[in-house]
């Protein structure tokens, strides 16, 4: 039996010493004390002076600079605690440190609540007088955004209550869901009895070439998730209701409106993405009709979605994954290699599998003066190579955006998926160019098509599930798990049409999706980013070297401009349904290419 890479090589774990030497580092408490002192000082110095008719550009610029210095210090302890906690959510000491930093953040933030509120209340004539001054030019985007948010702000006393209670409301329930899922063990039936597996270990078996292995893995997932049904359904209902209350208090019309405002996108643009994607679900059905034929099956069910169409998937050691990714990046620009090599050399990546480690993958960019960290669960599959590229893409974006000040450092969510998805495309293109036989090219292409479906159509199906779940909670009251199962299953099944039947065992699989708990309505950002990158990548293939600098400029902008403004510079109109349809057409072309290769 062939061993997986994680059994034959040591996978990297983080070195977080660039943040703190350890959980007992005196610098942690020292930084929290200093940030708290600076917050109190900031409040004394600036409160009541921002929303004033006589406000000068110089005074506002000084306040913004002090605010950034304070936040740069404040964010560091929480970032360290969050990174540490995600590698072992079962460790009480790590959980306690995470909670300590969150409570510190809340107590510090109570002294800062006034600032954004006062920016929103600067008299219009005063803002008109100072907004175009050279001193404020670097902060103009941030100021304009905060003033747009002002319509949804509460009074300072009310905002303080929400800040103070955040850790005992939704944030606490979201942490509970994370811990429940991280602690869950899945019991897979094998010869000799059941074998216990973590979430990351069981999910990878859905890609196994043996259908019975996939079936048993799926059954184990369903059984494990159903054990959590009561707790996770209660948690989700609580979060749905909390959002309903907050939306009512803040005068948001629809559940998703606050996310659109944060993302600096209009509801009309997001609706266009969602509706165009849903109108192209037929592409998914067409592909799975093809896949059923390739697999030689009479019908497909949910555990056949990711079945490889040829033989065993090769286990790829992490060192080889590194070479594949860096080699692909280097063909685009040596600059990408220069940015990414330190992630490997200085242990900015945590890839090992471990009990208690949360599932999934992410990249954490904290502040412009700190390097990002990449988190993943590396099992050695080809898709894990793509995940490594994806998260390093985020890291590239963070590094290139570090020339911005903190308040414009992070790109909004839809733009944050640009570099990550583009990085995947670079790896895919290189791998495709190295293959010689039609069979190999077909297998790679089918894997990419399925990944694209998961990023575009599945995320839109999830977004629609979220929309319906939030509305159902507001109209029907607390939702039983069966109702949530029904909404999940309906939206997921629509994507496949009559080409694949998900089956009742799949109905509870919403229970392990972290984004719907942690960041409501995040998921449409994936579809936005993937379809955007399909267009950008087509332009790169057409323009070659001329495109590279324009691409770097796009990433270097960070969050300094809204998506529509950033992309207008590349002659892209995000309000155009034709643009999004163009991306869906490119996906359909891949399906047609797969059909041609299959004969």
What residue spans do the PLM features occupy?
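A well-structured
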Residues: 1-311, 322, 597-599
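C-terminal, non-catalytic "cap/extension" segments appended to globular domains
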Residues: 7-10, 17, 21-23, 115, ...
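Long, K/E/R/D-enriched contiguous segments that form extended
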Residues: 294-331, 337, 363, 374, ...
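Short pre-active-site segment immediately N-terminal to the catalytic Zn-binding motif
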Residues: 314-318, 369-389
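Catalytic zinc-binding patch centered on the HExxH motif and its immediate surroundings
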Residues: 314-316, 349-371
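Catalytic Zn2+-binding segment of zinc metalloproteases
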Residues: 393-407, 426
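Active-site metal-coordination segments of metallo-dependent hydrolases
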Residues: 407-419, 451, 481, 519-526
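Post-HExxH zinc-binding segment in Zn-dependent metallohydrolases
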Residues: 412-440, 448-450, 454, 529
